[in-house]
Amino acid sequence: MLASRDSDSRRTTVRKTSDREVVVTRTFDAPARLVFEAWSRPELFKRWWVPRFMGMTLRSCEMDVRTGGKYRLVFGDDPASEMAFFGNYIEVVPNQRIVWTNEESGDEGSITTVTLEERDGKTLLVMSELYPTREAFDAAGTGAQEATHETFAQLDELLAELSAR
């Protein structure tokens, strides 16, 4: 298991399950419908996806969250330091599952699967990042997985706001 970064680490776990896969789990105090909206509505996604400690902003967020749809996310402080991430949605089941490709690395890109399971008004989220090879997994490093702790804490804040409405 990789180390936890957030103050509520008992709620987020990051585990390397094979030499090609990492799985993150977290329980959110919100219904699956709201968690899905936060993952699928660009105006909400922009508010939580980039960890604050990185000091960057999500400059552009284009998402067509449906099976066969595409996404493109552009990060950076200014146009000279922009990084683009893009891919396709392989499967989307509202309030239950989103599967997408990460194509910025070409053939070495991963496939991300997010599943949502609601129980008693809370949602268990399981996010799997599967790489095509061990070498691709190793090249990706653990930075993104470690940043997930802060990102999910930010998602918690957004979900609390949405739940209060």
Model regions: which residues?
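A short, structured loop/turn motif at beta-sheet edges
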Residues: 32-33, 65-66, 90-96, 115-124
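Hydrophobic pocket/interface hotspot
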Residues: 35, 45, 71-73, 89, ...
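Hydrophobic ligand-binding cavity/cleft-lining segments
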Residues: 1-55
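Beta-strand/loop substructures that line and gate deep hydrophobic ligand-binding cavities in soluble
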Residues: 21, 99-150
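Hydrophobic/aromatic beta-strand elements that line small-molecule binding cavities or substrate pockets
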Residues: 26, 60-63, 85-91, 102, ...
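Intrinsic-disorder/low-complexity, polar/charged segments enriched in Ser/Thr/Lys/Arg/Asp/Glu/Gln
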Residues: 19-25, 58, 70, 84, ...
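Short beta-edge strand/loop motif at the mouth of beta-sheet-based domains
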Residues: 23-24, 43-82, 165
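A conserved amphipathic terminal alpha-helix motif
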Residues: 1-8, 130-165
